Amino acid sequence: MIALIQRVSRASVVVDNQTIGAIDKGLLVLLGVEQEDTREKMEKLATKVMSYRVFSDENGKMNLNLEQVGGSLLVVSQFTLAADTGRGLRPSFSGAGTPDQALALYEEFVAFCRAKGVTTETGQFGADMQVSLVNDGPVTFNLQV
C-alpha cells in the first residue's frame, strides 16, 4: 500500500463541477492499493500517515504530527501509484489491487482515520476528479508498507 502525502495549507477535490471534499491545514493523501495489501497493512500505513512528523515546531524543525497541529486529511484514491514504470514507455498496472479490493481498503483507511478522531475528507473512488492543492513547503513524502 502506498500513500503519497503532501503537506498542504489547503486542498480540495471536485467531481462533476462540485467540491466534494476540502481541507485547510493538513495532509493530502493520494492512496494506492497493491494486490498484496491487507487490512493489517492499511492500519499500519494509516497510523504512520497520522503520526508522521512533517509539520514544523517553534524552531522550524519537522517535529509535529497531524494531531499536534490540528490538521485534517483529504484522502484520494489513486491506483496509478501502483504502476510498474520500470520497462517501456507505458505504465503497467498489473500490480495494482482489484477495484473491489482497492475500494474496500480505501474505505477502511478513511474509517480508521476518522475513528482515531482525525477530520477526514475524501474524493470519490473511481471518479474523474480534479484535485487542487497548495503544497506547503513543498513537502511531499512517499510512504509504503
Swiss-Prot record:
Subcellular location as annotated: Cytoplasm
GO biological process, one term: D-amino acid catabolic process
Keywords: Cytoplasm, Hydrolase, RNA-binding, tRNA-binding
Main location group: cytoplasm
Example of a GO MF term: Ser(Gly)-tRNA(Ala) hydrolase activity
Assigned EC number: 3.1.1.96
UniProt-recorded name of the protein: D-aminoacyl-tRNA deacylase
